[in-house]
Structures are given as structure tokens and as C-alpha cells.
């Protein structure tokens, strides 16, 4: 059986990266909440 996690830097950045978050309203909300919480890392 193939494992579910097949790491790929490109996929990682495209789906969870900062620019991907910035693009959508929901993503911007995520960034806002993470900033407010004081997360050391906002996006991947």
C-alpha cells in the first residue's frame, strides 16, 4: 500500500505557502489569526 504522505516541495508551497494563503479570503483569515496568536511561522 502506498503511503499517504509523498513529500514534494512544490506541492507544499502551492497549497500551504504564504502566497497561496494570501490569494483567498479564507487564507487571509488564517494569516490574520496566526499573526494575532503570535505564531513564529505564518505559513509553511
UniProtKB/Swiss-Prot annotation:
<dbReference type="InterPro" id="IPR020939">
    <property type="entry name" value="Ribosomal_bL34_CS"/>
</dbReference>
<comment type="similarity">
    <text>Belongs to the bacterial ribosomal protein bL34 family.</text>
</comment>
<dbReference type="GO" id="GO:0003735">
    <property type="term" value="F:structural constituent of ribosome"/>
</dbReference>
<dbReference type="InterPro" id="IPR000271">
    <property type="entry name" value="Ribosomal_bL34"/>
</dbReference>
<keyword id="KW-0687">Ribonucleoprotein</keyword>
<keyword id="KW-0689">Ribosomal protein</keyword>
<dbReference type="Pfam" id="PF00468">
    <property type="entry name" value="Ribosomal_L34"/>
</dbReference>
<feature type="region of interest" description="Disordered">
    <location>
        <begin position="1"/>
        <end position="44"/>
    </location>
</feature>
<dbReference type="GO" id="GO:1990904">
    <property type="term" value="C:ribonucleoprotein complex"/>
</dbReference>
<dbReference type="GO" id="GO:0006412">
    <property type="term" value="P:translation"/>
</dbReference>
<protein>
    <recommendedName>
        <fullName>Large ribosomal subunit protein bL34</fullName>
    </recommendedName>
</protein>
<dbReference type="GO" id="GO:0005840">
    <property type="term" value="C:ribosome"/>
</dbReference>
